[in-house]
Curated annotation (Swiss-Prot):
Keyword Lipid metabolism: no
Function (record text): Catalyzes the transfer of a dimethylallyl group onto the adenine at position 37 in tRNAs that read codons beginning with uridine, leading to the formation of N6-(dimethylallyl)adenosine (i(6)A).
UniProt keyword annotations, A-Z: ATP-binding, Magnesium, Nucleotide-binding, Transferase, tRNA processing
Gene expressing this chain: miaA
Organism (species): Shewanella amazonensis (strain ATCC BAA-1098 / SB2B)
Cleaved signal peptide residues: none
Protein name as annotated: tRNA dimethylallyltransferase
């Protein structure tokens, strides 16, 4: 039996029922909710992110939502630092931290730590961009293959962001991305009990995703995106505006396609997100699975987290 303080993870794809289960857990079992969602961090992005409603937040406050303006960026390292602070504060109140969300990279940084990668260097990036202009991405990929064949095998020549970053890391640090990612931060001093919730039938999940997007539209999602566009300082290259649904609604408002196409593209993008989330979870160690909609989920969560 571990003497470490207990921390609960409740993971799952979008639209799987995480919030409802977390609210029940927080209300009845001395838990406090910490959000693990890279979209819920942004203020003014409520409908399209399925942010908990005012009444839900009154039942159980959520930490790490509405902490940034959509213009600001937020890294996995930022999340880890914020989450550890919230976990410690929750434990100090004699409560159990319940981390809920679908941003798997954030959960992974809590479990595995972060590799000590160097910060971006504008001068090195400019040099790489000039070389690409002169020689092309394939030449850069050939260079990566010579210095770091493992990363070159994983990174496609047509993935400029990751390819450029791998070269940049080597030029700044003198170490390859493969070498640095093997170095992990010290593990956190908690006993992590991990759950995932998802429908057993993927077609059910697809139906829930489509239904939820229609509900968002009925609640005024397009108006929400219009308000964000009207600010004048936001654009589609920002991480906030790359959230599923927002990009497609923005492009619709720009006249790039009609309403029906926007709905189709947004639902398809959300399905792709759910597929990636499930892919992460299928390879996740020490995971307790719950079926979406099962009336016994709360009891299972309580019993298996003891």
């Amino acid at each position: 039996m571990t003497s470490l303080p207990k921390v609960l993870f409740l993971m799952g794809p979008t639209a799987s029922g995480k919030t409802a289960l977390a609210l029940d857990m927080a209300e009845h079992h001395n838990c406090e909710i910490i959000s693990v969602d890279s979209a819920l961090i942004y203020r003014g992005m409520d409908i399209g992110t399925a942010k908990p409603t005012a009444s839900e937040l009154a039942r159980a406050p959520h930490k790490l939502i509405d902490i940034l303006d959509p213009l600001e960026s937020y890294s996995a390292a930022d999340f880890r630092a914020d989450a550890v602070r919230e976990i410690e504060e929750t434990l100090s109140r004699g409560k159990t931290p319940l981390l809920v969300g679908g941003t798997m990279m954030y959960f992974k940084t809590l479990l595995d730590g972060l590799s000590p990668l160097p910060s971006a260097d504008d001068a090195v990036r400019a040099q790489i961009a000039a070389e690409v202009e002169a020689r092309g991405w394939q030449a850069l990929h050939d260079e990566l293959r010579n210095i770091d064949p493992v990363s070159a095998e994983r990174i496609h020549p047509n993935d400029p962001q990751r390819l450029s970053r791998a070269i940049e890391v080597y030029r700044i640090s003198g170490k390859t991305l493969t070498e640095l990612t093997k170095i992990k931060a010290e593990s956190l001093p908690y006993h992590m009990v991990q759950f995932a919730i998802a429908p057993q039938d993927r077609t059910v999940l697809h139906g829930l995703i489509a239904k939820r997007f229609q509900q968002m539209l009925a609640e005024g999602f397009i108006g929400e995106v219009e308000t964000l566009k009207a600010r004048g300082d936001l654009h589609l290259e920002l991480p906030s505006m790359r959230c599923v649904g927002y990009r497609q609604a923005w492009q619709y408002l720009d006249g790039e396609f009609d309403h029906a196409t926007m709905v189709e593209k947004a639902v398809a993008a959300t399905r792709q997100l759910a597929k990636r989330q499930l892919t992460w979870l299928r390879g996740w160690p020490e995971l307790h699975w719950l079926a979406s909609g099962d009336e016994g989920n709360l009891d299972k969560l309580v019993q298996q987290s003891r």
